[in-house]
Each structure stands twice: as structure tokens, then as C-alpha cells.
């Protein structure tokens, strides 16, 4: 009986993936009852409507974020609901199949570039480590699908399976269109016969036209659905929006100097933020370049495709420079019209994250293979020590994925709101309010987390609601009663420190232009109690039920 040998490299790779999944599972499902992904607080703000279409009436957050959810993402949420899995549940579970699919596609894609086991293993490990240290795949949002779909499209091109590439382009255009456009550019370069004279076969033209129509039509359809919330913000206008134009703003596009961070920032920077950086002068951008763009250029210059007798090498290796070229072109065009077609960074960063880390892994894998061969002959003990150190680094990288999970500071507050009737409308000033719509299905008037500035009508209306929440925090009659009735608020929630000091929490200050404080108003709670208002106080927060304010005057 023939015994099949176990591929030690594959076993190690699988072990690291399982380690990352286990760590995520522990954090997402065993660290508290209200834990969820950071960005999912936005995209699931309308989640109560999935099971009950009439839920959350006259809710600005639900109206906008329902429309902002791409078609395939909405279909996924409705499908999960039909199986009895709620929106937060499916968003939390998504990471498992997406990590598994990414790992499988990464291993196969790495094999298209290298037959040498060390280079293949290093390439696969570097790609997955980069994906796991970019929080997208854990986000539970459309962005979570970016890396596996990019890998799917690249594998299709590397193996000449154009049906796989077209399927990836279609799926990406329906759930996260920006990387699909960049990958469409890569596909166009891939189909081109670069031998002189340059030619493009009619079959390739037809295939590219089909892909182009699919991607562009899907993107325009999605953009048209958001037209009622526009027009979109212009770059010169963004400089006057606090959340964009301040370094610590929620959607910041500037560095510490105040200049637009074109090179390195999460939303407008060209380089993938494998290591967090923000600003054109941030020294960490050099590290990001070393981990992504520079390895692509190095392999492009040295022509490493000759190093392997790999049947897919001639097709696969050009994808590295094609990725850089297409990313640069698409990013530049998006930057010229920022933010008309989404964030410029979304056109370059997801693709360069995958292909740049792949190139880095191929380079380091080659160095490793040659170095280990020499040490095996001359210094076996040193070789073992280096292998041990490398293994520990790999374990540390996969044991510490960047998950960006959030938990409320006051679980008792979330539990209180969750116990109220389903139609309850909540307003106030407290950071924990950001989790309420997605986690409890109750309407919240406005929160800094949902203050997304790219569509001007939505941002204008949301800013007004944030100001209304701030005005209610003054607890000053008759303004309080008038605002409660105008906004039809059932429950007011305030950070106790805000009422005692009058100073807005930092997240609210970053979202709103000045003023950022009110007169301390904690002493005005006593008259509300005297008016038979139900008030609950804790050292962290104050809850005021407003039925006493909504009763008609005698």
C-alpha cells in the first residue's frame, strides 16, 4: 500500500489559518454578548427591516445605509434571515468562510508563481498575513469580500481560466465595485498580446467588452441608487468637513501637517496600510512600500519568471506589474474626481495588498531557500535557530489578526435599550449609541460613527440631527420638550460626564464643527424627576424616558 507523504508546508499553512480562525472565534463569540465588527455598525443600521420591512420608520440612518448596501450584500442578509440567522450573526460568521476561501485561493495562486516549496509557502503566508492584518475580512461588510474575490480573479488569469475571472468580476461588481474596476484593467492588460506588433484577438475583445459592460453597469446602477442622497462631496469641500479635514477625524484624509495624505491613509492613500500610517511624511509609509509596491517593481525588473519551470509562470508573472499599473491608473482617475466614484484608496489598496504581499513572499521565499541550503551544509545549528525564530514570528502574526471588534463600554445600557419596545426612538450623546441600531433594532437619531460625509444631503441632515441631540443634552425647557416632540424621541441617553462637564465626547467633537460644549446640565435632571419623568442614573450614563414630556399640557 502506497503511503502518501504529508506536505509539511501545506500542513503549517493550514495550522496557521486555523490559529487565526480560532483567535477570531474567541474574540467575536466569547468576549461579550454585544460584540460586533466596527464597520458593521454602519452597514447593519437598517438590519431590523430585514425581518420586518415596516421597522424603523422615518429613520435617516436606516434609510441611507439600506440604500448603501450593494445588491449582493443585501441578498446575503435576506438569505441568512430566511435560515434564521440575524444580520449581526451572519456578519460575524462571514469571516470563517472568507478566510478559508482566501487561504485556498492563495495557496493555489502561489503555486502558479513558484514550484519551489519554500517560495510557495512564503508567498502564501505573506498574502494571508497581510489580509489578516488588514481588518477588511473581519468587517462583516461588503469590503470583507474584496480579498477573496481579487484572489479569485487573479487565479483565473494566472491559470487562463477566464470563466473564473469573469465570475469574480461579476461578483465583485455586485458587492464591492471599486476593486472590480482595477481588476478589469488588469484583465485588459492580461488579454493583450504584447509581442510586436501589438494585437488583441476578437475573442479577447468580446470577453473584455462583456466584462467591462458587467462591471461598469453594476457600478453605475449602484451609484444611481444613492443619487437621492447626493450630490457627492468634492475634494475642496472635504477640507471644510471636520471628520475629513482633521487628523483624528473618523474619516480623516489628511496627515498631521493638514495636507491630503495621498501616499498613505486608509481612505485616500495609494499604498495599502499593511502597517497603519497616515500622511505623506509618515515614516511608516516606507515600510508599507517595502511590503507591497517595491517587491513588485523588484520582480518586474529582475524578471523572476525564468526561475521556475512552471507551466503557469509565463501567464502568472506579468500579473504583478499589471496590478501595479492598473492600480496606479485607476487610483489616479478616482483621485481626480474624488469622491464621485467612491474613495480613491479602494481602487489601489485592496489589489496591492494581495499582489504586493505575494511579491514580497516570493522574494523572501527565494532568499530563504538559498540561505537555508547554505546553512544546512555549513551551520546546521544556526539553521535550526533561524527556522525556530521564523516559526515563532509566523505564529505571532497569525495569532494577532487585526479584527477591529467593538464592545459597548456599558453593556447594561445596551441591555436596557434592547428591553424597550421595538419602535423605540433613541437620541442623546453617548458613544455606545453607535451599536444600538444594528444590535437592538431600535432607531437612534444620530451618532458620530454614522456621520459619513461623502453624500452631501445625508451628511447635512445627519449633522442637523447631531446638533439636535446636543441641544437636548442641555435639558433646558422649553427647548427640550420641543425637540423631543419634533423628533418623536422616546428615550434620551447621555454620557454622564457630558452632562456634568458640558464637554462633548471626543468622537462627537471630531464629527462636529465648534462649539464642542454646552453649559453643564446635570442639575436639570431633578426637575425632570419632579415632572414624573422616569430617570435611570449610573456612574457612566443617564437614561431619561420622555413620555412625561410628550403628554399634552393640562
PLM features: residue spans?
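Hydrophobic/aromatic-rich transmembrane helices and adjacent perimembrane loops
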Residues: 340-372
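Transmembrane alpha-helix segments characteristic
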Residues: 307-337, 359, 388
